[in-house]
Amino acid sequence: MDKKKLLYWVGGGLVLILIWLWFRNRPAAQVASNWEGPPYMTYNQPQAGSVTLPVAGYTSPSPTLPNRNRSCGCNPAVSAAMAQGADLASKLTDSITSQLNDYASSLNDYLASQAGV
């Protein structure tokens, strides 16, 4: 085996090792296909009107009962957390807006005093 062939084998092996190291530490949700749906649908607790499959963390909708929790794309805990987050975001936005308005008015006053208006 000449040097060129040996170099190709070593380089290919290093590439395979790098690929293995890259995927070894990644969470399964990033590697696996997204067949369970978005992440907020993959909670481990079974939801009302669903059949628990032997796949960890996946519940399929029952063919007979309507699954009201899954039809909106989220469970009640996630809905409550999203509402709380939206409330906090609106409060934060209001606070930042008022602070920026105060800063802008004080800056206008300062600039007007400097200009002698």
UniProtKB/Swiss-Prot annotation:
Localization of this protein: Virion membrane
Organism: Enterobacteria phage PRD1
Organism taxonomic ancestry: Viruses, Varidnaviria, Bamfordvirae, Preplasmiviricota, Tectiliviricetes
This protein's UniProt keywords: Capsid inner membrane protein, Membrane, Transmembrane, Transmembrane helix, Virion
Function noted in UniProt: Protein of the infection vertex complex, which increases the vertex stability. Anchors the vertex structure to the viral membrane. Essential for viral infectivity.
Topology in the lipid bilayer: Single-pass membrane protein
Gene: XVI
Residue ranges that the Swiss-Prot or TrEMBL entry lists as coiled coil: none
The UniProt record lists the keyword Transmembrane: yes
Main location as per UniProt: virion
Transmembrane spans: 7-24
GO cellular component labels: membrane; viral inner membrane; virion membrane
Name of the molecule in the record: Protein P16
Domain of life: Viruses
Pfam families: DUF1970
